[in-house]
Amino acid sequence: MSGVLVVIPARWAASRFPGKLLADLGGEPLIVRTCERAAAMATADRVLVAVDDERLYAAVTAAGYEAVMTGEHACGTDRVGEAAAASDAEIVVNLQGDEPLLDPVDMDRTVHALHEDGEADIATLAHPFVDEQEWRDPSAVKVVSDDWHHALYFTRAPVPGAHPGGEGDAWRLARRHVGIYAYRREALARFLALAPHPLEKREGL
């Protein structure tokens, strides 16, 4: 068992913009731009797009990338799990289909984090917020971590909280989560075996 498999879950439906993954971005569909970024990762041995619609499949394969049709799933991670089931990759990277601007060097860091820390099972990315307005935006997922960069909580709410009048620059203490996860194969299997938690469903994460 070895190697790194990057799976890009891509579904047609979207609450605000159905079919957005085929939106033009510099002459190519958004999903193809995301594939280009994934393929540029130094750590990636294989890039696979897990789709639920023939239009997405056609766009991805026409651009020369590998795609697989998947069934109905409640979340992208479940779709990744189905696509990765036939692979023996040691690490599976879940890269969201609408992340065409991520730097491949940063994406590689998630894989390196697992190689460097034998006790870590999952790695992801986050960066500082630009300002308080971005921090308050519910579409921006927040993560609060400890001094060792272990995530404590992911939420759409503006965290950390503060006593009335003491909020100040609380937004500087959180980070904005980025849509990529690197899993050890066993950790992904354990996650997929869990029932969705009420907090997960409430937050839509």
Where is each model-derived feature located?
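Hydrophobic/aromatic residues located in beta-strands of well-ordered beta-sheets
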Residues: V6, V47-V49, V92, I122-A123, ...
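Short phosphate-binding loop-to-helix
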Residues: L48, E54-H112
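Donor nucleotide-sugar recognition loop
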Residues: A195-L205
